[in-house]
Structure formats: structure tokens, C-alpha cells
A protein has these predicted regions:
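Class I S-adenosyl-L-methionine-dependent methyltransferase catalytic core
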Residues: 1-173
Length: 173
């Protein structure tokens, strides 16, 4: 099985770096509070690796970056709708008891399989990464982490990146 790699541009590489740094800080803070489990949830995990449009080098995707963070997250929940990306993700990550790869629509997977297990009373916290390929995310999914007690961190980048990406494509960077 060959690993499926999407080609990404400068802004996606920058976004991956920002997410990696934020996730590292988040994990350090929560790991220092021994009573908490802290999960990493990626709703649009992709295939695990990308190819840089500028350097042509392999670039680790957000799931691989998260798996390299020290101290590690307690659990990882990685979701994607594309069966080829799921297959690639499984090939890149291998079998790990702390990694749960979910194949399906993130709206349903998060609301039915992941979010119900993030209970305040069980001392579970999560960094939820919502970075859709398009604008196809239900509002209920975006809103749900904010309803947890205490509110969970989550990120979405599509609206921030799109105007700059359009300028880049027009050669105005």
C-alpha cells in the first residue's frame, strides 16, 4: 500500500507549524495537572503526510505532529471521510492502542462517538482541531466543544487562510 500524500502550499505548512506549537503548549499544561486525561481530536486528519509545493519534501500532517509531541496526549482520535486517506493514515501510524482512527463524516463521528466521552466528571479534556477541506462542517459540531465544562479549545483556519491564499494565487504575496 502506498501512502497517499496531498500537495500543500506555504500557508498550509505555516498552519501546521502553528497547530504543532499550540498543541505542544496545550499538552504540557494539561500533562502537568496529573488528574486530567487530555485527548487530541482531529476532525479532518487526512492521510498523515503531505508534499510541500515549494520544496517537494514530505511534510508531516497534523496527526503525525501530534503523535510526536512530548509529553504525549492520552488519546488521539483521528477522523476522515476519504477511505484512501484513512488507509494511508493507518499505514503511516501503524497499530497503537492510544490512537483511534475513525472513518466517516466528522459531524456524526464527533457527535456520536467522541464528544460523549469527553466528560467533565471523568477529568477528560481535549484539543479539538476543526480544519475542514471546505465549508462543510455543521454548526452543531463547531459549537459543541464550547458547551463542555470547562470549554474545550478548538481551532478552524479555513476562513483565516482563504483571503491570503487567494492573494498568493494572484501572485501578490
Amino acid at each position: 500500500m502506498s501512502v497517499r500524500s496531498d500537495e500543500i502550499g506555504y500557508w498550509s505548512e505555516l498552519k501546521l507549524e502553528i497547530v504543532r506549537k499550540y498543541a505542544t503548549a496545550y499538552s504540557k499544561i494539561l500533562a502537568a495537572q496529573k488528574r486530567f486525561e487530555h485527548w487530541y481530536v482531529d476532525a479532518f486528519a487526512g492521510g498523515g503526510v503531505h508534499v510541500s509545493r515549494t520544496s517537494r519534501q514530505m511534510v508531516p500532517g497534523s496527526p503525525l505532529n501530534a503523535l510526536l509531541i512530548d509529553p504525549p496526549f492520552t488519546e488521539y482520535h483521528l477522523v476522515d471521510l476519504d477511505p484512501r486517506k484513512i488507509e494511508s493514515l493507518r499505514a503511516v501510524i501503524g497499530k497503537r492502542s492510544d490512537v483511534h482512527i475513525h472513518s466517516g463524516n466528522c459531524d456524526e463521528v464527533l457527535l456520536r462517538q467522541v464528544f460523549p466521552h469527553l466528560n467533565y466528571s471523568d477529568f477528560r479534556r481535549a484539543l479539538v482541531l476543526l480544519d475542514p477541506y471546505g465549508l462543510d462542517l455543521r454548526w452543531e459540531v463547531s459549537r459543541q466543544p464550547a458547551n463542555f465544562e470547562p470549554p474545550r479549545s478548538f481551532s478552524t483556519f479555513q476562513r483565516w487562510i482563504e483571503p491570503q491564499r487567494s492573494l498568493d494565487q494572484a501572485g501578490e504575496r
